[in-house]
């Protein structure tokens, strides 16, 4: 058992809507959970990023999310409207691991895909942030002012940098490669018996793992999904 409690808005394997390992753990009651609306997760991370104890929000009002999470509190607006809002607590992270397209050794990063997801909030909400990067380059190669648009957070937030080409596999890292659907299906099926999958792919060096799935060239040739 690796996880004691999981706070989440949605758990999937991208192209596979229901994550089978997560489903199995929930059905067996092996983990404590706090299921939230995705907007509440975002607001909790934002509160942590701003070093606030909570942020008021309308997200979650009128839903069973609050019924199933009685620890969540309400707050009343101090202004004339006196609106009742959810006081979403900060989701303070001990550690964040973020995969990026490029970085230098100092922690300057670039995320060039079309959707940065919550990566910036993860970095700001965490006590320590570690970066795995497709490419580790010199600071000059990040492009100066022209490349700054792809830098989502300051290097001062970064604790360490790891060079991990194809490090997002079997998920995608746009624009370099897409989802490895075949591998995701294999991983999903492994919920029935994880030992075989573990022996085949885990407890290896990064390069050994890449080789076990066909090598970097195979991964880099996986097409990006079209939405």
Q: Each predicted region: which residue ranges?
A:
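Conserved alpha/beta enzyme-core scaffold
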Residues: 1-227
């Amino acid at each position: 058992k690796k996880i004691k409690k999981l706070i989440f808005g949605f758990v999937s394997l991208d192209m596979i809507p229901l994550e089978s390992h997560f489903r199995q753990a929930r059905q067996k009651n092996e983990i404590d959970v706090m299921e939230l609306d995705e907007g509440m997760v975002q607001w909790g991370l934002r509160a942590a990023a701003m070093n606030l104890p909570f942020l008021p929000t309308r997200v979650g009002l009128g839903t069973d999310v609050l019924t199933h999470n009685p620890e969540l509190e309400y707050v009343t607006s101090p202004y004339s409207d006196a609106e009742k809002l959810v006081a979403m607590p900060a989701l303070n992270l001990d550690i964040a691991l973020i995969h990026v397209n490029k970085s230098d050794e100092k922690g300057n990063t670039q995320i060039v895909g079309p959707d940065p997801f919550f990566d910036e909030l993860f970095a700001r909400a965490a006590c320590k942030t570690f970066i795995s990067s497709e490419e580790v380059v010199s600071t000059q190669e990040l492009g100066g002012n022209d490349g700054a648009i792809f830098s989502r957070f300051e290097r001062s937030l970064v604790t360490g940098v790891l060079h991990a080409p194809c490090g997002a596999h079997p998920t995608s890292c746009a624009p370099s490669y897409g989802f490895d659907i075949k591998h995701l299906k294999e991983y999903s099926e492994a919920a029935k018996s994880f030992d075989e999958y573990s022996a085949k792919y885990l407890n290896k060096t990064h390069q050994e793992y890449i080789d076990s799935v066909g090598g970097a060239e195979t991964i880099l040739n996986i097409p990006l999904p079209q939405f």
